[in-house]
C-alpha cells in the first residue's frame, strides 16, 4: 500500500471528543485503526486516539477515492481522515461510547503508516502473558486502561506540584551520582572513569541532600525524584522507582501531618474526583501491632486480634501455659460465622501461619451443640467461658489462636486477618481508609549482628521524653516517625530529624559505628550541623504505589510506562546487556563472573 505524506495536514479535533453538538461540522481526525468492518457498500472504521474511539464511515457516494483506499486498511494502520460529522440513524446510537451519537463520513483519507499484525489485541481486558506485554510495551500502552493509568499519574504529579507550590515549597533537584553509604539496601554502583577504582552510587533517596538543603536555609523543599535499590523484586517494588520527597524547616509533627493530609485530599480530588475526609486517624505503632498484627493495618474490616495472655495463663493446655510462662503471648481472632469451616480449610490456614513462624493454629468451633475443639478438654468450664466472653463468641463463630513470642503472633495473625477478610469478601474495594501510624520504635536489636538497627533510618529523631533512654535502653526509645497507610499499604513515611551533632553522633554509636566510621560516611552532614541547623522534618511518598492504589491495579508495573520485570530486566530494550571489552578497559574493570553449572546430560536408556 502507498503511504501518504504528512505534509500540510492538521488535526482539527480528537475523535473521542466528538459529540452530537459537532453535527454538521467538517473535521480532520488522526489516529489508529482499532477495527475495520466491510459491509459491502460501506466500510466502517473505529478510529482510536488518546481521547477514545469514533466511528468513521467510508461511502463511495461521499468520498470515492477514500472508500477505495479504505479497502486496504488494516488494524493499527495510522490514518488521517477529513469528513463530515453526522448524527447516527435512529436505532444505531451506541450508548456505551461517548462519541456514540455521531459518525464521521470520510471525504478524504491519508494512510500515514501501515502496521504488522500485533501479537495481541489492542483492547482492555486482553488475556496475554505479561512478558509479551512488556516486550511490546509500545503496543500495550496503546490500550485505553494503560493510558488512563498514565493520565492519572500525570494528574497526580501535577496536583502535587500545584499544592506544594501554593504552600511555599521549592522544587530543587539533587544529584543522581552520589556517595555510597552501605547501611541500607544494596546500591547500584557507577564506576568513575576519571577516578579509577572509585564509584558513585545511584541514590536510594535524597535523604541527606534534603537535610543539607534545610541547613542551607531553603526551608521548604520538594522534588518528584527517581530512586534506586538493587534488591529482590515484588509486586510493589522496582529497581528504579519514583517518590515525592518533601522536607520542611521549623515544623512540628502535627503541622506537617495536617499539611500532608490536605495535600493527599487535594490529589484525590484533582486526579480522581474523589472527596477525602480529614483528619486521618492516628494509631500508635504498639496499638497497630497489637490490634491488627501489622504496622500497615487495613482498616476496611474488623477481625481484630484479641489478647488472651492473662485469660489463659493458668490453663492446663501446655502450649498456652508454657508460652505465657516464657514471656510470650496468646492472641486470637473471632472469625464470625465461620464455624462451618472444614478441617481442610483450617489446615490450609495453619499452613499459612506456619510461614510466619507459628508452630500451630488452635481453634474452637462454636457449633449448635456448643464449643467444639481438640483443646477444649484442657479448660475448666470457667476458663473456657472466660475465653468465649473475651472473644464475644456466638454460635456459628470460629475462634483461631496463636501462641508464641509477640513478633510471631503479630505476623501470623496479621496474615490470618487478611486471608480471612479475602475469603469472606469483607474488603470493600471502593473504600479508602487512611491512617497515620506513629510512635515507632527508634531502633531494634539484631541478635545475630549483636547491634541495633534503625527502624527507619539513622537520621530519625527520638521523642523528647525518651531522650534519657538513649544511653541506657535504646530499644525502648520511640521515634518521631510516622507512616501514612491506605488500605493496608504504606503510601509514605517520614520523621522529624535529628538536627544536633551530639545526638546524631550518639545515634551512630548506638548503631555500632565508631566515630571514625561515622565521620568517613557522614562527615559532611556532621560538619553541616556545626553551622546552625534548624529543626526540620519531612516525608517521602511512593508515587508508583500511590498510583497503583488509585487505579485499582495489582502491580506497580501497570502504572509505570517502562517497568522492569520481576527479574530486574527490561524486555523491550533487552537490558541489562553486556558491554564491550573496550568499555570495561576504560573503567579499569575486569569481570569475575560466576561459573555456570553444566547442563545435565540426558539419562541413558
Swiss-Prot record:
Its main location: cytoplasm. GO terms for molecular function: aspartate-tRNA ligase activity; aspartate-tRNA(Asn) ligase activity; ATP binding; catalytic activity, acting on a protein; nucleic acid binding; transferase activity. The keyword Membrane does not apply. The record marks 39, 91 as: Important for tRNA non-discrimination. L-aspartate binds at residues 183, 229, 456, 497. Its EC number is 6.1.1.23. ATP binds at residues 229-231, 238, 490, 542-545. InterPro entries: Aa-tRNA-synt_II, aa-tRNA-synth_II, aa-tRNA-synth_II/BPL/LPL, Asp-tRNA-ligase_1, Asp-tRNA-ligase_1_N, Asp/Asn-tRNA-synth_IIb, AspRS_core, GAD-like_sf. Keywords: Aminoacyl-tRNA synthetase, ATP-binding, Cytoplasm, Ligase, Nucleotide-binding, Protein biosynthesis. It is found in: Cytoplasm. SUPFAM superfamilies: Class II aaRS and biotin synthetases, GAD domain-like, Nucleic acid-binding proteins. One of its GO terms (biological process) is aspartyl-tRNA aminoacylation. It catalyses: tRNA(Asx) + L-aspartate + ATP = L-aspartyl-tRNA(Asx) + AMP + diphosphate. GO terms for cellular component: cytoplasm. Residues 207-210 are annotated as: Aspartate. PROSITE patterns: AA_TRNA_LIGASE_II (PS50862). It is an enzyme of class 6 (ligase). Homodimer. Belongs to the class-II aminoacyl-tRNA synthetase family. Type 1 subfamily. Aspartyl-tRNA synthetase with relaxed tRNA specificity since it is able to aspartylate not only its cognate tRNA(Asp) but also tRNA(Asn). Reaction proceeds in two steps: L-aspartate is first activated by ATP to form Asp-AMP and then transferred to the acceptor end of tRNA(Asp/Asn). NCBIfam families: aspS_bact, PRK00476.1. This is Aspartate--tRNA(Asp/Asn) ligase.
Amino acid at each position: 500500500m502507498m503511504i501518504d505524506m504528512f505534509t500540510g495536514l492538521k488535526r482539527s479535533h480528537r475523535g473521542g471528543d466528538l459529540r452530537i453538538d459537532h453535527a454538521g461540522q467538517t473535521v480532520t481526525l488522526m489516529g489508529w485503526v482499532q477495527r475495520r468492518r466491510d459491509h459491502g457498500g460501506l466500510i466502517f472504521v473505529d478510529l482510536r486516539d488518546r481521547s477514545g474511539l469514533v466511528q468513521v464511515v467510508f461511502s463511495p457516494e461521499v468520498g470515492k477515492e477514500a472508500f477505495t483506499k479504505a479497502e486496504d486498511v488494516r488494524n493499527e494502520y495510522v490514518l488521517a481522515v477529513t469528513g463530515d460529522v453526522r448524527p447516527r440513524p435512529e436505532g444505531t446510537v451506541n450508548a456505551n461510547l461517548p462519541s456514540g451519537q455521531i459518525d464521521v463520513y470520510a471525504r478524504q483519507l491519508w494512510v500515514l503508516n501501515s502496521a504488522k499484525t500485533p501479537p495481541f489485541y489492542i483492547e482492555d481486558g486482553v488475556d496475554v502473558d505479561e512478558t509479551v506485554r512488556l516486550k511490546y510495551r509500545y503496543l500495550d500502552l496503546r490500550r485505553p486502561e494503560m493510558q488512563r493509568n498514565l493520565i492519572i499519574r500525570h494528574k497526580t504529579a501535577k496536583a502535587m506540584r500545584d499544592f506544594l507550590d501554593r504552600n511555599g515549597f521549592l522544587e530543587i533537584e539533587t544529584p543522581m551520582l552520589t556517595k555510597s553509604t552501605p547501611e541500607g539496601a544494596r546500591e547500584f554502583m557507577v564506576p568513575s572513569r576519571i577516578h579509577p577504582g572509585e564509584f558513585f552510587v545511584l541514590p536510594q533517596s535524597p535523604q541527606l541532600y534534603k537535610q543539607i538543603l534545610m541547613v542551607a536555609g531553603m526551608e521548604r523543599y520538594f522534588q518528584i525524584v527517581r530512586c534506586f535499590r538493587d534488591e529482590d523484586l515484588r509486586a510493589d517494588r522496582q529497581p528504579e522507582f519514583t517518590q515525592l520527597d518533601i522536607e520542611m524547616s521549623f515544623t512540628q509533627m502535627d503541622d506537617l501531618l495536617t499539611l500532608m493530609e490536605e495535600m493527599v485530599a487535594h490529589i484525590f480530588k484533582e486526579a480522581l474526583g474523589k472527596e477525602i475526609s480529614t483528619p486521618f486517624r492516628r494509631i500508635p505503632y504498639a496499638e497497630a501491632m497489637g490490634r491488627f498484627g501489622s504496622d500497615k493495618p487495613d482498616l476496611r474490616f474488623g477481625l481484630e486480634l484479641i489478647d488472651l495472655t492473662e485469660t489463659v495463663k493458668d490453663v492446663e493446655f501446655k502450649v498456652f501455659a508454657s508460652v505465657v510462662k516464657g514471656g510470650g503471648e496468646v492472641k486470637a481472632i473471632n472469625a464470625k460465622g465461620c464455624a462451618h469451616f472444614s478441617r481442610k480449610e483450617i489446615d490450609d490456614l495453619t499452613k499459612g501461619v506456619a510461614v510466619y513462624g507459628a508452630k500451630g493454629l488452635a481453634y474452637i468451633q462454636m457449633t449448635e451443640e456448643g464449643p467444639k475443639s481438640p483443646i477444649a478438654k484442657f479448660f475448666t468450664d470457667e476458663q473456657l467461658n472466660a475465653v468465649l466472653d473475651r472473644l464475644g463468641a456466638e454460635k456459628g463463630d470460629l475462634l483461631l489462636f496463636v501462641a508464641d513470642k509477640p513478633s510471631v503472633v503479630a505476623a501470623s495473625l496479621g496474615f490470618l486477618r487478611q486471608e480471612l477478610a479475602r475469603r469472606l469478601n469483607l474488603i470493600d474495594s471502593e473504600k479508602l481508609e487512611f491512617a497515620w501510624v506513629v510512635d515507632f520504635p527508634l531502633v531494634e536489636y539484631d541478635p545475630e549482628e549483636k547491634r541495633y538497627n534503625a527502624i527507619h533510618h539513622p537520621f530519625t529523631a527520638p521523642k523528647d521524653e525518651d531522650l534519657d533512654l538513649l544511653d541506657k535502653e535504646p530499644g525502648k526509645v520511640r521515634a518521631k516517625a510516622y507512616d501514612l497507610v491506605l488500605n493496608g499499604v504504606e503510601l509514605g513515611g517520614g520523621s522529624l530529624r535529628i538536627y544536633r551533632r551530639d545526638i546524631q553522633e550518639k545515634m551512630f554509636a548506638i548503631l555500632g559505628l565508631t566515630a571514625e566510621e561515622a565521620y568517613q560516611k557522614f562527615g559532611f552532614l556532621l560538619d553541616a550541623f556545626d553551622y546552625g541547623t534548624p529543626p526540620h522534618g519531612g516525608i517521602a511518598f511512593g508515587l508508583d504505589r500511590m498510583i497503583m492504589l488509585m487505579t485499582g491495579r495489582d502491580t506497580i508495573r501497570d502504572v509505570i510506562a517502562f517497568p522492569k520485570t520481576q527479574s530486574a530486566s527490561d524486555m523491550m530494550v533487552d537490558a541489562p546487556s553486556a558491554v564491550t571489552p573496550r568499555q570495561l578497559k576504560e573503567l579499569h574493570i575486569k569481570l569475575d563472573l560466576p561459573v555456570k553449572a553444566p547442563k545435565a546430560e540426558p539419562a541413558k536408556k
